């Protein structure tokens, strides 16, 4: 029986049938080699796995080592035994990590949002933004409801009838009372910054302080004819040196949409911002290898700084457990369940891809500082497209505060139980709505959620002075809040990526999406006497030399 000769491809290379005898012989030899060196093969797989996840393991180990080191130094005398100079040197590596991360937040947020908004057509941009805001709103409401339910079930403030004065740190200042209207006006002021050119304006937010002033009023004093003096509290908006992420987000999105409207004329500027963003991500990859050292000393320094940490855990242990349990349930059950229901993918594999940003969030206690690492991990390890992650994650770092909303609800119920106040249905609904709304304007900075807790307490007529008890342990609870906040941002980006993959969202100009990868920059042709430098040649994809055209450059 004749056997057909092997066929050749157009390039003249003979194709080899993988089912031929030589292929089976090669496969059997490989199997024999694998069986002979099975131990070595498994050892190599373990080494490859460790090398691939080295940064994750180092970051988690650094966080655990920071807790152990901090407790050990506290047992040996703490910050007082070290002295001011030694404690400053002890905490300096952690401070350096924060400064490195904050250094690249400004270019990263601006460039990523401009590139992401410009890469999507207006209809797709609107749909993505609407779905993202809906996801953030639903998850924040769920976290608020979970916080209220846990606080009502565990009753953390019922057994806290008498508080020892040593529980409250003397260095903690009481948070001032803030009106709801002033908080809303602050949100609007920060959305529209007055100056983006000044270097300090981007790192400046508006805040309202209350100043007590004596006012002369006309009138007759009962004891004689003299003007009366009354004391009044007046609101006084001022600027604080904190990064105005909300203002940068609003400006960058609007500017990116404007570049999209320009069409080809704005393509060069879009490519500039994309290249700037890629260079910033290279800096992020370098900083990530310093993150374990910084996280170790950040966590250890904060524990050493606290006074009488044992008494704090004894007095407020039930409140801490309630907050941490709520964050664990929402982060390990609720968010993964939502992700699985909509994507049908393993959510815990997605979580493993963002372990490094989660550990960084625990160490830095700042959603904004974790943003660069989160962008890099969701793109490289979880397969989220750049124009989605760089558009959604900065918005999530500003408006998505699941952890803060849960903590605020637990704290409000805790203070209500502490003061013996019963919460009816109307007050519970008030707590849920106020916590969800106020968490949107909470700054992505350490202790940002505590600043908005006063709004909830004022809404249900609770004393604001009890916030000092919350501040005493906020250094721990706030880290758990930050981990949950950034986890919600990452799951939101993953859900939107799945939505885009299912719907195959069209774009009116696909070449604007990731211009750097799709448009190759070729060197300009040599100038000739007959050639016009303002003319460029366009060749058809077929490569036919006769099919050439000339048109005036749009650049």
UniProtKB/Swiss-Prot annotation:
Keyword Metal-binding on entry: yes
InterPro entries: DAACS (IPR050746), Na-dicarboxylate_symporter (IPR001991), Na-dicarboxylate_symporter_CS (IPR018107), Na:dicarbo_symporter_sf (IPR036458)
Gene3D superfamilies registered for this protein in UniProt: Sodium:dicarboxylate symporter
Intramembrane region coordinates: 348-378, 428-461
Stated role: Sodium-coupled antiporter of neutral amino acids. In a tri-substrate transport cycle, exchanges neutral amino acids between the extracellular and intracellular compartments, coupled to the inward cotransport of at least one sodium ion. The preferred substrate is the essential amino acid L-glutamine, a precursor for biosynthesis of proteins, nucleotides and amine sugars as well as an alternative fuel for mitochondrial oxidative phosphorylation. Exchanges L-glutamine with other neutral amino acids such as L-serine, L-threonine and L-asparagine in a bidirectional way.
Family assignment from sequence similarity: Belongs to the dicarboxylate/amino acid:cation symporter (DAACS) (TC 2.A.23) family.
PANTHER family, per the entry: NEUTRAL AMINO ACID TRANSPORTER B(0), SODIUM/DICARBOXYLATE SYMPORTER-RELATED
Annotated protein name in UniProt: Neutral amino acid transporter B(0)
Species: Rattus norvegicus
Gene: Slc1a5
